[in-house]
From Swiss-Prot:
<keyword id="KW-0472">Membrane</keyword>
<dbReference type="GO" id="GO:0005886">
    <property type="term" value="C:plasma membrane"/>
</dbReference>
<feature type="transmembrane region" description="Helical">
    <location>
        <begin position="316"/>
        <end position="336"/>
    </location>
</feature>
<keyword id="KW-0812">Transmembrane</keyword>
<keyword id="KW-0868">Chloride</keyword>
<feature type="transmembrane region" description="Helical">
    <location>
        <begin position="168"/>
        <end position="188"/>
    </location>
</feature>
<protein>
    <recommendedName>
        <fullName>Voltage-gated ClC-type chloride channel ClcB</fullName>
    </recommendedName>
</protein>
<feature type="transmembrane region" description="Helical">
    <location>
        <begin position="222"/>
        <end position="242"/>
    </location>
</feature>
<dbReference type="InterPro" id="IPR023790">
    <property type="entry name" value="Cl-channel_volt-gated_ClcB"/>
</dbReference>
<feature type="transmembrane region" description="Helical">
    <location>
        <begin position="291"/>
        <end position="311"/>
    </location>
</feature>
<dbReference type="InterPro" id="IPR014743">
    <property type="entry name" value="Cl-channel_core"/>
</dbReference>
<keyword id="KW-0997">Cell inner membrane</keyword>
<keyword id="KW-0851">Voltage-gated channel</keyword>
<dbReference type="Pfam" id="PF00654">
    <property type="entry name" value="Voltage_CLC"/>
</dbReference>
<keyword id="KW-1133">Transmembrane helix</keyword>
<comment type="function">
    <text>Probably acts as an electrical shunt for an outwardly-directed proton pump that is linked to amino acid decarboxylation, as part of the extreme acid resistance (XAR) response.</text>
</comment>
<feature type="transmembrane region" description="Helical">
    <location>
        <begin position="5"/>
        <end position="25"/>
    </location>
</feature>
Length: 418
């Protein structure tokens, strides 16, 4: 047991450095090509001329597509999905290291050029890749899946500063592939990755700064639960839209470079209306949580961002949809809160409360992982007072969504790339 905990610690350290490496590479490319050192792609888009804002995501998609197509022709193999750590956990615990690194590089290109796709998917993949590489050299074959799971959880902890949610992500989303006794090393890896990541970044701040002064009462629990019902209905709709967009892009029968370029061009067009569509949505989420906008502003940004996410994911841009889903959930919750706020004197607090609830419940509705989703929002914001209400709402959202749409967002993604 001590040996496993020691290896889990090493895996956590490797994962933290893998995540930090991707993050610093992303910042470097943003500085080189966008003249942006703020770390915010929305700020970068705001400072660009309209024609550069239009073309940059398309050029990034074109470059990523050329890279993927070149690799495919070189190896005569069809590329794997960028989240192939899930496939590795469900099969024999082995990676195609070269293909995974190429996918990560392609993800780096589309992320830094403004596509509305998550950077964290590549971060988690690289963390799992580092763990797998270490495991194959120093551990027996029957343990390889465990260390990939530890690496993925550690990568998620380092990317989102949420070690418990990262651990439960593995336990819930991949339920049945791990023994409960194996959760110990997973948690150790996740916590170590968070601590090392904090040392690298010289910060232990929460991912999102929220000033929620409300004391949750009976009325608030009712609103939280009703938001869970709403998210349970919206989750399957989002998954259906993503699947339809993917089929639409595939039906065009374009070569990968042109398909990704088209997705990027759509993002560029939308960014002419609002630069908030650029990137994974992190900075927009933070700005909404700091000062919730008016109803019509939320609605406008939400529609543009939703179309950008659908275009990016539908075109096959390598990356995750975890963080974009958080923004969509936040916007749905805030739209609901703004509508209800017309009838309550504390409309601002209700909007913020239901925005956080929307983040958790839509995540639960799309991942079918209610416990992970609840802990994720609590760990990212520090608002643990919401935990009981969020847990109930997330379970409701997950049950409704699972009833209406059998597959989670991860199973749907795997099916699209199989």
């Amino acid at each position: 047991m001590f040996r496993r905990l020691l290896i889990a610690t090493v895996v956590g350290i490797l994962a933290a450095f893998a995540v930090a490496g991707f993050r610093h590479a992303m910042l470097l490319l943003e500085w080189l090509f966008l003249n942006n050192d703020s770390g915010s792609l929305v700020n970068a888009a705001t400072n660009l001329s309209p024609w550069r804002r239009l073309l940059t995501p398309a050029l990034g998609g074109l470059a990523a597509g050329l890279l993927l197509m070149g690799w495919q022709k070189f190896t005569q193999q069809r590329p794997h999905a960028p989240t192939d750590y899930m496939e590795a956990l469900q099969t024999d615990g082995q990676f195609d290291y070269a293909a995974s690194l190429v996918k990560s590089l392609a993800s780096l290109l589309v992320v830094t050029s403004g596509s509305a796709i998550g950077r964290e998917g590549a971060m988690i993949l690289l963390a799992a890749l580092a763990a797998s590489c270490f495991a194959q050299r120093f551990t027996p074959r029957q343990e390889w899946k465990l260390w990939i799971a530890c690496g993925a959880a550690a990568g998620m902890a380092a990317a989102y500063r949420a070690p418990l949610a990262g651990s439960l992500f593995i336990a819930e989303v991949l339920f049945g592939t791990m023994m409960l006794a194996s959760l110990g090393p997973v948690i150790i890896s996740a916590v170590v990755a968070l601590l090392v990541s904090n040392l690298i970044n010289h910060s232990d701040a929460l991912l999102y700064n929220v000033q929620l002064s409300v004391t949750v009462q009976a009325r608030d629990y009712a609103l939280i639960i009703s938001t869970g019902v709403l998210a349970g209905l919206c989750g399957p709709l989002l998954l259906t839209l993503m699947n339809a967009c993917h089929r639409g892009f595939v039906s065009l029968k374009l070569a990968p470079p042109w398909q990704l370029a088209l997705g990027g061009l759509i993002v560029g067009l939308l960014s002419l209306f609002t630069p908030a569509v650029w990137g994974n949505g992190y900075s927009t989420v933070q700005s909404f949580l700091t000062a919730p906008p008016l109803l019509m502003i939320i609605a406008g940004i939400f529609l543009c961002k939703l179309c950008a996410v659908l275009a990016s994911s539908g075109s096959g841009a390598p990356g995750g949809v975890f963080t974009p889903t958080l923004f969509i959930g936040l916007a749905i919750g805030m739209l609901y809160g703004r509508s209800l706020g017309l009838w309550f004197p504390d409309g601002e607090e209700i909007t913020l409360l239901l925005g956080l609830t929307g983040m958790a419940t839509l995540l639960a509705a799309t991942t079918h992982a209610p416990i992970m989703s609840t802990l994720m929002i609590c760990e990212m914001t520090g608002e643990y007072q919401l935990l009981p209400g969020l847990l109930i709402a997330c379970v409701i959202a997950s049950v409704i969504s699972r009833t209406l749409h059998r597959d989670s967002i991860y199973r749907q993604h795997t099916a699209q790339h199989s």
